[in-house]
UniProtKB/Swiss-Prot annotation:
The gene is G. Arg-352 is highly involved in rabies virus pathogenicity. Its mutation dramatically attenuates the virus. This is Glycoprotein. It is found in: Virion membrane. It comes from Australian bat lyssavirus (isolate Human/AUS/1998). Gene3D superfamilies: 2.30.29.130. Attaches the virus to host cellular receptor, inducing endocytosis of the virion. In the endosome, the acidic pH induces conformational changes in the glycoprotein trimer, which trigger fusion between virus and cell membrane. There is convincing in vitro evidence that the muscular form of the nicotinic acetylcholine receptor (nAChR), the neuronal cell adhesion molecule (NCAM), and the p75 neurotrophin receptor (p75NTR) bind glycoprotein and thereby facilitate rabies virus entry into cells. Residues 1-19 form the signal peptide.
Amino acid sequence: MLLQIVLLMSLMVFSPCPGKFPLYTIPDKLGPWSPIDIHHLSCPNNLIVEDEGCTSLSGFSYMELKVGFITTIKVSGFTCTGVVTESETYTNFFGYVTTTFKRKHFRPTPEFCRNAYNWKVAGDPRYEESLHNPYPDYHWLRTVTTTKESLLIISPSVVDMDPYDKSLHSKMFPKGTCSGASVPSIFCSTNHDYTLWMPENPKPGMSCDIFTTSKGKKASKGGKVCGFVDERGLYKSLKGACKLKLCGISGLRLMDGSWVSIQNHEEAKWCSPDQLVNIHDFHSDEIEHLIVEELVRKREECLDALESIMTTKSVSFRRLSHLRKLVPGFGKAYTIVNKTLMEADAHYKSVRTWNEIIPSKGCLKVRERCHPPYNGVFFNGIILSPDGHVLIPEMQSSLLQQHVELLESSVIPLIHPLADPSTVFKRDDEAEDFIEVHLPDVQKQVSGIDLGLSEWERYLIIGASAVVLFALAIIFAVCCRRCKRRKKARTDRIELDRKVSVTSQSGKVIPSWESYKIEAGGHFRS
């Protein structure tokens, strides 16, 4: 039963629930019945779906998803950020130097970013040198500005690739998607205008390493491929398959959601956007191995039952259940009528739930109606119990249920649009380990004489200086005037002294009028 599982997926075309593995198989075409001898009994080949007579097997190689392939394709790259480091030095009147560093950003070019990354990988010494701040120069009473442009390379920076169209997805991209071409042949813009993302490998096609080559056998009829036996021995039909490209490689998406690189199936149409590919992990591979083992075990049980029938020359309903075909396709159905072994050609379809074939008590639904029992016997070991319930020998196994749940849970898209930021840096100092820089020439700019004052302080001092100079000018003018007055007064006094000096009668010089009066009076009295 578990076996039917994978094989039917291909034949799910006949199932109301395409893409699901069956719980059971029941004929949708049956009859007519004819008596046979026990020597005509045979065990069906459940490993090969013999539908449409495609029984010719030939070896071939095909590609499928790698085992252990996760839901996303990780593409390693690096971010390139343009950084401008600016140093300002000012030397005051006394020779004291003040240095200030500032950082700005600029948008780099992809060519320079690629060169910078190559320098980092090659260990170019310019990488180390360009990380240093520009060497500050200085001039007395001047401000010297020195700028240095660098390209900061940080790697690894991992993004996700969608294998359906090879587009890139990450939180760092605007709207979560690379704004460039679908193939990251050049660069991707980021949420920061001054940062670009580029793939480490300039040939991004190499990043799509998700396939592995397997060997199997093609089942065909007249050159038409009906299906194939995969590397694990499980048959998969191409019925219901659709064409789908993964990472630019053409192939087929089968009904079970798996993908193979079979390209000569002309009847297949292109898949719709909602038809995604299932992941291929170790668990699904393990289940496939178990299914193949179960199919082999069921065939051995069938052969044991057939041997018992031949040995004992007797047939029971329970033994007939081993002869049922476990996968969809053409086969045989057996029953016992009036102690006579009967056989009929049948085409089996998959059954997902028991309600599909037992809609009500006592009803076994075959060909859209309740199949009539004969003396409480249907076919393939199915009987009607005394209380009127339909009894089927096979019961759902835990392995089958496990596989059904596995397939249902793994139908997820390969795209994973959001990258985990924690995958970029694993430790705090990792960014410093992956820095690489493109170093243009250092630029220097020397200002005029500068007192190191702000603009308002400069105007304030200029105004105060003007007032002081004006006051000094006034004081100087006043002082000059006073000096002139003193000099003139001294000159006038000398001239006056010269004018009032007279000669007395005795012939002596009299210096003043008063002296003259005194001297004259004395002479007069005598």
